[in-house]
């Protein structure tokens, strides 16, 4: 193994362990409320990045459903709230509608499969901040996943016309 591979692997392991260490300390960060009946409180802990302003977090809330060949989606809005007295953001997905799908005829013999169907709507892209957890309150039957987006180093220039 090359020196870079060893360092990259060690760095990833350290970031993962750091994230796990943070994961047990939500109550130490701030008094986020417990989830109400019918909801779960799901938490995302982010590793520290060198230039966090170049990153965004896409929150992927959804359900694993049995679907055919059509494109499926759920509907909803992720609302940002503030933890009173602290000013820390948290997010609430109040209700989820659907599923909705395209209505194309599937080719004969196409099997149904179980896939993660995301909620599509407003508010699902949030600022990257490794100093605070991303706390999401979602209905019990909704799973929360996330994806990290990063800005390209290449910056284009607009042309006056």
UniProtKB/Swiss-Prot annotation:
Keywords: Disulfide bond, Periplasm, Protease inhibitor, Serine protease inhibitor, Signal. Residues 1-23 form the signal peptide. InterPro entries: Ecotin_C (IPR027438), Ecotin_sf (IPR036198), Prot_inh_ecotin (IPR005658), Prot_inh_ecotin_gammaproteobac (IPR023084). Pfam families: Ecotin. One of its GO terms (molecular function) is serine-type endopeptidase inhibitor activity. Disulfide bonds join 69-106. It is found in: Periplasm. SUPFAM superfamilies: Ecotin, trypsin inhibitor. One of its GO terms (cellular component) is periplasmic space. Belongs to the protease inhibitor I11 (ecotin) family. General inhibitor of family S1 serine proteases. This is Ecotin.
């Amino acid at each position: 193994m090359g020196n870079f591979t060893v360092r990259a692997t060690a760095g990833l392991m350290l970031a993962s362990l750091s994230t796990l260490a943070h994961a047990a300390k939500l109550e130490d960060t701030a008094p986020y409320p417990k989830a109400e009946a019918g909801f779960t409180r799901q938490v995302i802990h982010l590793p520290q990045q060198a230039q966090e302003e170049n990153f965004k977090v896409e929150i992927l809330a959804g359900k694993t459903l049995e679907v055919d060949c059509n494109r499926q989606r759920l509907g909803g809005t992720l609302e940002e709230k503030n933890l009173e007295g602290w000013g820390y953001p948290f997010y609430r997905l109040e209700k989820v509608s659907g599923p909705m799908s395209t209505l194309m005829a599937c080719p004969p013999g196409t099997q149904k499969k179980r896939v993660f169907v995301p909620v599509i709507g407003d508010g699902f892209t949030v600022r990257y901040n490794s100093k605070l957890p991303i706390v999401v309150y979602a209905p019990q039957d909704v799973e929360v996943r996330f994806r990290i987006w990063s800005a390209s180093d290449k910056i284009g220039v607009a042309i006056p016309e």
